Amino acid sequence: MNKELIEELKAQDFNVVAVSKMRTKEEIDEVAKMGLTTFGENRVQEFIDKYDPKYTWHIIGHLQTNKVKYIVGKVDVIESLDSLKLAEEIEKQANKHGIIQKVLVELKISEDPNKTGYPFKDAKNFISQLQEFKHIQIKGIMCVASKTEDQALVESEFEQMHTLYLELKEQYPDIDTLSMGMSQDYKLAVKHGSNTVRIGHAIFE
């Protein structure tokens, strides 16, 4: 565990999601004892295996519609809402549980064909459509920036996200989360307005 980094992160005024994929329950407990208690999982099965209600959980990986029923009611935030079909299923399951599910809309800001997310240019229209769902609360937007040595490109992606976030925040009072930045680029993301970072190996190793 990187105790020094954990202490440094706790002192900051942004939220930290400790990405716990491939980590054991023991490692999660150890990080929690050091003061970080929000964890992010990529895969539903792994989340179910590790779920502990005393911690806060985010799903941050691509989410299949048929897996939604296993996580609604347990997960605090679904950070990877990227389609209307997925929104409909989250709405259905949240309604069944009698809860309002917090979500972030994942936007595809990178040109990388392997990245998932709703097309960035259509984000406003999509978020407007999502307002019809009574059991979904849109808390903000999320992205995974390009994995590249080109810092200017990454900064440009973060800046576009931040500009959109500020515009959405004015329009929708519930929106308060801009989730961007991981182990390799979180400092850059925070510089460009991120208030939630998702850090895995830098914390756990």
What is each stretch, according to the model?
Residues 1-184, 190-192:
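Conserved alpha/beta-domain cores
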Residues 165, 199-201:
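C-terminal active-site rim and adjoining tail of enzyme catalytic domains
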Residues 190-191, 201-205:
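Expand to "…catalyze enediolate/carbanion chemistry for C-C bond making/breaking, isomerization
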Residues 196:
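Conserved N-terminal glycine/acidic-rich loop preference
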